[in-house]
């Protein structure tokens, strides 16, 4: 049988027992027999039996050990003792411990069965351990008892202070809140065992923040404790809350947190103007909507509670001024509503009201939430430009008005008190034709040139008025002049008329309809009257019929017209209008006599241009145009092909092939310049001109002398002689750089001699040119000095 406990001097123990110890609190030994637990105390054996038969008031669980956490001693902590009734104390029984923490946290004396804790125990990390114990025969290793499981529970002590979940806390509560208004709830937790003692029982209290706030000791709810807290007096509060365990008793652990409480604003302060009277001034020339001044009502509230609405409630300038509210700065801006005049009114008085648009009903007793102030506005005089009365002129003038006639009196005056004299003029940019002028003193607008409605029917001019004493003050007015029509234009044919009459025409046949135009524009409308001119009133050939619709018909009076007798008739027609006075003009109608077929189709007459369109059909005309277009395309194609043909080479009678002489200038082993000579120009030296060309890749330090080369072999047409002349030119040039490559010139023809023309070879010629000065040019010209300097006459360059 197993027995667990802290053993005393008792020797005769039987059955399965468990001893429970509470280190630091109790020292009891309990033996469990048949489900009954009895405490064992140290004493004589004769008293032990009586003790065992005394029943405890409570039952003990045989398979549990309890040990306090956070043991700080230096020796291992004794937990309890395991004992088997098979153990006779001779060391033949070996106790083995296994399970959670065995060998690491807990150890067992394999001989005595004593269990010790060798590490610090923390209930908050682990509250219990489950282990298994076994008794073995030390010699054979055979189990003496079945393996038994037991639990070691860690007994809590108050080793953890309460901790707040969050912090610091931030909260707000409206100002003027009643006492007991909830602000925020804070919560602290204690890691100790809440089921054992008061180690985890937390009590809240305020260390700082009274008498403004209070906290519920059990829930941690913070409430207002003082009535009528005013944000404008104090806005921010710092409250320190303490949470203490052990129910707040002495010796308990405590933690603190900070709660920052802000009083939010309510509309409990009415607006007030800092001044009861404002004095402002404005120029009379201030434009409409310009700012006169600003007023502001102070409100101790903030945000929406400090918003302001300004209005004009009284005064003699309600229709002259406006006030608007600046939503960003809550300022009332007074502006000009109508134009001002110092001469009309010099000052105004306004009563301005500022009010809160957002009110709270529970604070209406603190009102009224509005205030008024008086604004005095003075209008300042300025030197204003002259003002025209009226501000616009409209004048109607007949176009036959005489030059110099007054058509309108323009009037302007100085609005200032000084009433300066006015001088008038016309803005010439508005009257470029200079049709009008204005009297400088009286303002009489007169005509300066004849007016013609048919040319310009409307004139828009600008008249200027300037103060005599202050020319910078200039006013202007627009004058619109409408030129009225008079009957000054005679009617005339609408276009040039040319009629045709057939030889077989009958009397009374219509040959032409005529109409007329008139540049005039009478109010009653145009109406024209047609008749034959007096000299043709009794015309035997043609007659005229007025249709009374501004048109007239020309009719034949007889038949039997003959081209060979007279092929053209001129018929004068008189056209009159209905104006006052009546104007008329004579237009001449040209009538051609033509031969026609029986259907009246013109066949031939002197005006061939009119016969063709009549005799040709539309299809024939299209065919003719198509043929003309095709011919034009063919001509353009032929011209284009001829331009693209290559010109044949001109070969003289001897069939000599002309080549080009190409000169290559090589320096440093590379071709730098190429000069090509057209052999056609060199073929006839009499006509060719010698052109000296300088090298473009090198400029001498000293300006080159004029290189004139006599025209050698002018009478010789052989190219060989021309090349010799070029060689001579190279020899005579003092500044020409040498060509270090062999120049080959090829010429196919009779008598061609190919020789070296290299400038290096020219040293061997009979030229008297000396190159000794090259030695004085420095190391850069050393190579040239060696090549062109004085050498042994017996030596050869190549």
Curated annotation (Swiss-Prot):
Quote any Pfam family the record assigns. Cadherin
The regions listed as transmembrane in this protein's record are 619-639
Q: Propeptide spans which residues?
A: 36-58
Query: Which residue ranges are assigned to the Extracellular compartment in the record's topology?
Result: 59-618
- Specify the superkingdom: Eukaryota
GO biological process, alphabetically ordered: adherens junction organization; calcium-dependent cell-cell adhesion via plasma membrane cell adhesion molecules; cell migration; cell morphogenesis; cell-cell adhesion mediated by cadherin; cell-cell junction assembly; homophilic cell adhesion via plasma membrane adhesion molecules
Q: How far does the signal peptide extend, from start to end residue?
A: 1-35
Q: Please report the stretch or stretches of sequence annotated as the Cadherin domain.
A: 60-164, 165-273, 274-392, 389-493, 493-615
Glycosylated residues, per the record, are: 47, 260, 419, 460, 541
Q: What Gene3D superfamilies does the record tag this protein with?
A: Cadherins, TCF3-CBD (Catenin binding domain)
Under InterPro entries, the record lists: Cadherin, Cadherin-like_dom, Cadherin-like_sf, Cadherin_CS, Cadherin_Y-type_LIR, Catenin-bd_sf
Q: Motif Cell attachment site, which positions?
A: 88-90
List the GO molecular function terms: beta-catenin binding; cadherin binding; calcium ion binding
The UniProt entry lists membrane topology as: Single-pass type I membrane protein
- Function, please? Cadherins are calcium-dependent cell adhesion proteins. They preferentially interact with themselves in a homophilic manner in connecting cells; cadherins may thus contribute to the sorting of heterogeneous cell types.
Please report the name of this protein according to its UniProt entry: Cadherin-20
Native species: Gallus gallus (Chicken)
Gene this protein is translated from: CDH20
